[in-house]
């Protein structure tokens, strides 16, 4: 799949500080390390500037999991646990399970509910109103969504 890069002025404009609230999704391996829990807490506490649209559980594999699928499931459960602890009214139906494996290569996406949702959601945005993607885990969900969505998406990562 061949993609063309946006013109330099367009790219530079995307780097400017937004003047109002921005729409954000968080792709996170929340169970893996504590920084992800802080990031989620910050997003929940910053809804005037950051309009949270979805949460995606990312895969991870280390001593805290038996494999990427187990890491993703633990992160999914941790997201729900943190939302409950925070007393958040963020709808649980906007929390999505991510990929159960890592990307096998640069061309092959790994589909998941998270990747499907992000691909669909990203198509609703424009260069003047981009979707901000905060990815602080493995990039499998985001890369798979971008592969699926194609060149018509407008996201800032």
How does the language model describe each region?
Residues 2-73, 102-157:
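Active-site histidine-anchored catalytic micro-motif
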Residues 77-96:
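A glycine-rich helix N-cap at a beta->alpha junction
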